[in-house]
Amino acid sequence: MGCYDYVRFENKDYVLPDSLPVAGIVFQTKDLGGNFSTIVIDHDGSLVMDDMWKLFQDIEFYFYTVVDGVLYEYKAFFQGGVLTKIEVVL
């Protein structure tokens, strides 16, 4: 099992929830109106998202995990409001 340190988004105001489940990577977004949205990426790379994420057109974001003491960085790509890929940043 890994622990999840932080998520870095580009040009947005985002916050991590207080606790992260071991089942996957979970983080929340907070818009200017104070509304929250949650996104989950499971260990198998599958994405669970709510309707708010479907509003995004083109966005890239980074997230990090530490597994067995090794730091992994990932970059996720949305195009046209759809997640198109998640890649490991080497």
Where are these regions (language model features)?
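Amphipathic alpha-helical packing elements
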Residues: M1-G24, G33
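Acidic, low-complexity, intrinsically disordered interaction modules
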Residues: N35-V70
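Short, compact, well-ordered microdomains
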Residues: E60-L90
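Surface loops and adjacent helix of pleckstrin homology
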Residues: S19, M52, V88
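Broad, structure-driven detector of short, well-ordered beta-strand segments within folded domains
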Residues: V7, I25-K30, N35-G45, Y72-G80
